[in-house]
Amino acid sequence: MKALQFGAGNIGRGFIGKTLSESGFSVIFSDVNQNIVDAINYNREYFVKIIGSNQNKTVNIKRVSAINSNDSNIKKIISSVDLITTAVGPTALEKIALIITQGIIFKIKNQFTKPLNIIACENKIKSSSFLKQVVLKNLPIKYHDYLNKYIGFIDCSIDTIIPSINNKDDLFLTVEEFKEWIVNINQFKGAVLKIVDMKFSNNLDAFIERKLFTLNTGHAIAAYLGLIKNYKTIQDAISDKKIRVIVRSAMEESGSVLIKRYNFNKNDHLDYIEKIFLRFENPFLSDKLERIGRNPLQKLRREDRLIKPFLGAFEYNLPYSNLAKGIAAAFYYHNKNDLESIELSSSIKKQGLESTIIKICDLPVNSKEVYSIILEYNLIKKIIR
């Protein structure tokens, strides 16, 4: 069995590539970073250190190779593999879709009918379904029947933390023991692939939003509040009592939305929040706040980790004040090394805060949602002082 993994970064190598290799796949990584591509092809293996609650261990990931995403030979690889996975970030999916489309056309023209399943592992709800729609837009209509018959786009939810830790070995990664990969079993074409620790669900939306509204929401709010106070790591931020209270309260507010929407058991969900806090506190997974908080425009979109649970609270008439504090912190934060942060700060300066919130978050003009964010923005220094 062969798999093509777009993205040879932390999640690509430390979670997806590792899991697929352990499941018996030969894994081909595709990335635009030629240095990473060369390193993988030179070593043909890499090492991953797993940090657990009781013990740590290092595993050797073998049967790996790599190709630059701009290499024209990638379409041949796409036509021959059993599985394609991605971990490139939601904003890069449209570029990946163009590459996948060319591979599918090559597969069709060579009359290959072996099913191909594609799993986009991104922090975007139903990212594989989104990827499918972009592929269909670029694929000639005469090939649509083939795609619907032989190409599966499987939506998923992934949950793990892989921090960026400097190491002499560019391929070496440190990962947490906890990992979760849940997929929609109904979207596979052909036989369902056997992948270690992969879980199947008929109610994937609930798991996707549980992870997005809890891990991602808490992570982002801790990062933006912590960065405003000049903290460096997630552990530093969570150790601050005021930040800790806001983050936990925000996760409980988003949790109330999940409980209302999906009928989750309240005590079970509070236990889930507690487990995530323990993961945040793990000193061996010291994650930098700049990494967690990067790309604020993406994180402030209507369907992402901050605004979606916030709007859910309004929808069900539930508390939202701590979610609003986290959103305000994202608008307040500025990083001169982050292009999206620069763009966000520039918009606030030129267009004003209210107009920027309405535009970036796609919120109604003169709405309670917008004014609640503005209120918290104006109080942000008092909140965390």
UniProtKB/Swiss-Prot annotation:
Alphabetized InterPro entries for the sequence: 6-PGluconate_DH-like_C_sf, 6PGD_dom2, Mannitol_1_phos_5_DH, Mannitol_DH, Mannitol_DH_C, Mannitol_DH_N, NAD(P)-bd_dom_sf
Binding site for NAD(+): A3, L4, Q5, F6, G7, A8, G9, N10, I11, G12, R13, G14
Keywords for the protein's UniProt record, in alphabetical order: NAD, Oxidoreductase
GO molecular function annotation: mannitol-1-phosphate 5-dehydrogenase activity
Reaction(s) the record says it catalyses: D-mannitol 1-phosphate + NAD(+) = beta-D-fructose 6-phosphate + NADH + H(+)
Pfam families in the record: Mannitol_dh, Mannitol_dh_C
Keyword check for Transcription regulation: no
Family: Belongs to the mannitol dehydrogenase family.
Name the UniProt record assigns to this protein: Mannitol-1-phosphate 5-dehydrogenase
Record lineage: Bacteria, Pseudomonadati, Pseudomonadota, Gammaproteobacteria, Enterobacterales
